[in-house]
């Protein structure tokens, strides 16, 4: 698989879970002999929600919530067939979203 690159983009709400998954992917790829670029921390996406505390009156009394989505990017340069097989067998945590582009 010469001159190819696998780009893996990970998203999670919990950054500790995300970093643990990134370490598993990097360790697996290095063990099979592939070169790694990253992990690159991408900007954290913050969604803020403002809702009324009361169901009826008091518009001025509000409560604020936010959801932070942490993201990482890993490039695997010149992956071998064993690298692809090892990544397919890898079992990551349930709270991590993985997008793979070849």
UniProtKB/Swiss-Prot annotation:
InterPro entries assigned to the protein according to its UniProt record, in alphabetical order: Ribosomal_uS10, Ribosomal_uS10_CS, Ribosomal_uS10_dom, Ribosomal_uS10_dom_sf
Function recorded in the entry: Involved in the binding of tRNA to the ribosomes.
NCBIfam families: PRK00596.1, rpsJ_bact
UniProt name for this protein: Small ribosomal subunit protein uS10
Complex and partners: Part of the 30S ribosomal subunit.
Coiled-coil residue windows: none
Entry similarity comment: Belongs to the universal ribosomal protein uS10 family.
Any one Gene Ontology BP term: translation
Record has Nuclease as a keyword: no
Organism: Syntrophus aciditrophicus (strain SB)
Record-level GO cellular component terms: ribonucleoprotein complex; ribosome
Listed GO MF terms: structural constituent of ribosome; tRNA binding
HAMAP family assigned to the protein according to its UniProt record, in alphabetical order: Ribosomal_uS10
Keywords from the named record: Ribonucleoprotein, Ribosomal protein
């Amino acid at each position: 698989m010469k001159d190819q690159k696998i780009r893996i983009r990970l998203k999670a709400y919990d950054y500790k879970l995300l970093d643990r998954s990134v370490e598993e992917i990097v360790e697996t790829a290095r063990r099979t002999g592939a070169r790694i670029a990253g992990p690159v921390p991408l900007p954290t996406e913050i969604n803020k929600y403002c809702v009324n505390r009361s169901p009826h009156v008091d518009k001025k009394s509000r409560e604020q919530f936010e959801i932070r989505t942490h993201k990482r990017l890993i490039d695997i340069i010149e992956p071998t067939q064993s690298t692809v097989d090892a990544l397919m067998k890898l079992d990551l945590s349930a709270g991590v979203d993985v997008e793979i582009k070849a």
